[in-house]
Amino acid sequence: MAVYEAVIGLEVHVQLATASKLFCSCPTTFGQPPNSNVCEVCSGMPGSLPVPNGQAIHFATLVGLATGCTINPRSIFARKNYFYPDLPAGYQISQFELPICEHGHLDIEVDGVCKRVGITRIHMENDAGKNIHAQGENISYVDLNRAGTPLVEIVSDPDMRSAAEAVAYLKDLYAIVTYLGVCDGNMEEGSFRCDANVSLRPVGAKEFGTRTELKNLNSFRNVQRAIECEMARQQDLLDDGEKVVQETRLYDAVKNITASMRSKEEAHDYRYFPDPDILPIEISDSDMERWKAELPELPKARAARFVEMTGLPAAEVEVLVQSRGLADFFESAAGLSDARKAANFMLGPLLRECNSRGVNAADPAAWNMKPEALAELVRIVDQGLISSKIANDIFGDLFETGVMPERYVKEKGLVQISDSSALEEAVDAVIAANPAEVEAYRGGKTKLISFFVGQIMRATKGKANPALVNELLAKKLS
């Protein structure tokens, strides 16, 4: 039986976070009443003329710069001709022979192994509308609110060899476009979705096998499962001596199967030609330099710097850079306190509070707690004003109210007892109340020290300085 390897390429559709559509002034707001964000241009009325959105061109260029692409100073819009009810003009405005960006790459890591995935091209295009199939009715409706929304399609080289590599590539790309602020990243609303081209070939073969395209995968989990499912389907066909048919397939997440949708089109089927209504897009040298200067530090570079700052494992630091807002929050707090301790508070109690309260961990701007408050919490623990246990106990209140920690602990009477004479009284009382445990401790059961510490902490309502308690106990029990 032959051993096969997968050949996978992704076509990722990124909805650009512009206020208006690609060729008209209609808003791109999601969730509006059907056909309310529509005009003559995006509804494909004869005689209407498209005007390119400058912000979309800017955003597309930023994506190209962030992925190491060559930016073409001159690019051309083309008409992609096909019929579908949600495509009112009978063609999609896309780019073909001369896209805005070409020849980029993304470096991914899977199981500690780094790999470079090439990016063939990035081109701009307008989105189609949406067909709504009424349940129980023999009728379909068309909502054109989405028609004309600006997209960039990021086409990878067929360099991935497993579903895990495809997901790693997709997650890295997602991090980049959300860091850049060019996409809101809402996969449920279709802002970031992909098509996967999957084929199998014998290991060591140079030629590609027959590929199938899996359409409109809108979650990382579904991408992983759909590719694995399709690989298994093709493997079964080839093992049985059958041929894989080139076609477009849909993934059914409930049944975990892929089903045939239609035969796969080639580029010539769309009869591309330059759009006669739109002049070539030209990017000036001054615009290019200005946009290059706008590029933020990207997630991988920032993660590497945070590892150096904190000494934490890369896997933990990756959580801190999962969104630009979260990374900015950490950077602000770390600049005012011990970076590693600030990171530990964020990775522990802070994310715990986000999860328990259903708060978006990627959007610190919506939190009541500010970076200055987290930094102050780190500092007052370091100064001995409160113990780390108290800090963890009060974190929920601090997160909810946004009050500064030092003020909070003083108002609540939670300041740590670090006066040895005051603590000595509590230590003596606990020793006097537990003679059997004292005798056992002195007889060699030294683990009982934690029992004594616990009793003292209970007596002082958690306010005793643990280090000083241990020191006093060691002296009095010896």
UniProtKB/Swiss-Prot annotation:
Function as written in the Swiss-Prot or TrEMBL entry: Allows the formation of correctly charged Asn-tRNA(Asn) or Gln-tRNA(Gln) through the transamidation of misacylated Asp-tRNA(Asn) or Glu-tRNA(Gln) in organisms which lack either or both of asparaginyl-tRNA or glutaminyl-tRNA synthetases. The reaction takes place in the presence of glutamine and ATP through an activated phospho-Asp-tRNA(Asn) or phospho-Glu-tRNA(Gln).
HAMAP family, per database record: GatB
Pfam annotation, one family: GatB_Yqey
Keywords: ATP-binding, Ligase, Nucleotide-binding, Protein biosynthesis
GO biological process terms on file: glutaminyl-tRNAGln biosynthesis via transamidation; translation
Assembly and oligomerization: Heterotrimer of A, B and C subunits.
EC numbers on record: 6.3.5.-
Molecular function in Gene Ontology: asparaginyl-tRNA synthase (glutamine-hydrolyzing) activity; ATP binding; glutaminyl-tRNA synthase (glutamine-hydrolyzing) activity
Keyword Hydrolase assigned: no
SUPFAM superfamilies with a match to the protein in the record: GatB/YqeY motif, Glutamine synthetase/guanido kinase
Keyword Electron transport: no
Name used for this protein in its record: Aspartyl/glutamyl-tRNA(Asn/Gln) amidotransferase subunit B
Similarity field: Belongs to the GatB/GatE family. GatB subfamily.
Reaction it catalyzes: L-glutamyl-tRNA(Gln) + L-glutamine + ATP + H2O = L-glutaminyl-tRNA(Gln) + L-glutamate + ADP + phosphate + H(+); L-aspartyl-tRNA(Asn) + L-glutamine + ATP + H2O = L-asparaginyl-tRNA(Asn) + L-glutamate + ADP + phosphate + 2 H(+)
Species of the source: Desulfovibrio desulfuricans (strain ATCC 27774 / DSM 6949 / MB)
InterPro entries membership: Asn/Gln-tRNA_amidoTrfase_suB/E (IPR017959), Asn/Gln-tRNA_Trfase_suB/E_cat (IPR006075), Asn/Gln_amidotransferase (IPR018027), Asn/Gln_tRNA_amidoTrase-B-like (IPR003789), GatB (IPR004413), GatB_C_1 (IPR042114), GatB_Yqey_C_2 (IPR023168), Gln-tRNA_amidoTrfase_suB_CS (IPR017958)
NCBIfam families: gatB (TIGR00133), PRK05477.1-2 (NF004012), PRK05477.1-4 (NF004014)
